[in-house]
């Protein structure tokens, strides 16, 4: 039995096909979803979506949003998403270093919050490349 997974951003469909299992980053922790999962709606955190397909695990960097799970269908609406295989490792590492430097230079509460979010997004992209 499989699940139909659809990952959408405001600009495109990132994923729309059947999968065996997913591990979804939510604001209250990661949740595993198998076929016949109980219906839920949940906030999606910045983090790694893990997708099991044909005995392999694939990764996707998610940048926060919402997910609806029900009747073997998962719809994930996020601000942005990238498949781990589509992320350029050098560019992601460079972005991470810039985000770390910007956090050190941040002055005031607003800049610190924005720099922390940018750092979380950059770390997630790097982790999506290296995750299994």
Swiss-Prot record:
CDD domains, alphabetized: F1-ATPase_delta
**Pfam annotation, one family:** ATP-synt_DE
- Name the major location: plastid
GO CC terms in record: chloroplast thylakoid membrane; proton-transporting ATP synthase complex
What is its subcellular localisation?
A: Plastid, Chloroplast thylakoid membrane
This protein's source sits in the domain of life called Eukaryota
Q: What does the UniProt keyword field contain?
A: ATP synthesis, CF(1), Chloroplast, Hydrogen ion transport, Ion transport, Membrane, Plastid, Thylakoid, Transport
Q: Per UniProt, what is the membrane topology?
A: Peripheral membrane protein
Extract the GO molecular function terms from the UniProt entry.
ATP binding; proton-transporting ATP synthase activity, rotational mechanism
Q: Which family does it belong to?
A: Belongs to the ATPase epsilon chain family.
Role of this protein: Produces ATP from ADP in the presence of a proton gradient across the membrane.
Summary of subunit composition and partner proteins: F-type ATPases have 2 components, CF(1) - the catalytic core - and CF(0) - the membrane proton channel. CF(1) has five subunits: alpha(3), beta(3), gamma(1), delta(1), epsilon(1). CF(0) has three main subunits: a, b and c.
Protein name, entry field: ATP synthase epsilon chain, chloroplastic
Q: Which organism is it from?
A: Coffea arabica (Arabian coffee)
């Amino acid at each position: 039995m499989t699940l139909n997974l659809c990952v959408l951003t405001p600009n495109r469909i990132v994923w729309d096909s059947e999968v065996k299992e997913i591990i979804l980053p939510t604001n209250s922790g990661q949740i595993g979803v198998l076929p016949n999962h109980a219906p839920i709606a949940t906030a999606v955190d910045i983090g790694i979506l893990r997708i099991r397909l044909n005995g392999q695990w694939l990764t996707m960097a998610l940048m926060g949003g919402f997910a609806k799970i029900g009747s073997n269908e998962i719809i994930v609406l996020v601000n942005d998403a990238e498949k781990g295989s589509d992320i350029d490792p050098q560019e992601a590492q460079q972005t991470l270093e810039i985000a770390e430097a910007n956090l050190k230079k941040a002055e005031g509460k607003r800049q610190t919050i924005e720099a922390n979010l940018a750092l979380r997004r950059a770390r997630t992209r790097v982790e999506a490349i290296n995750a299994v």
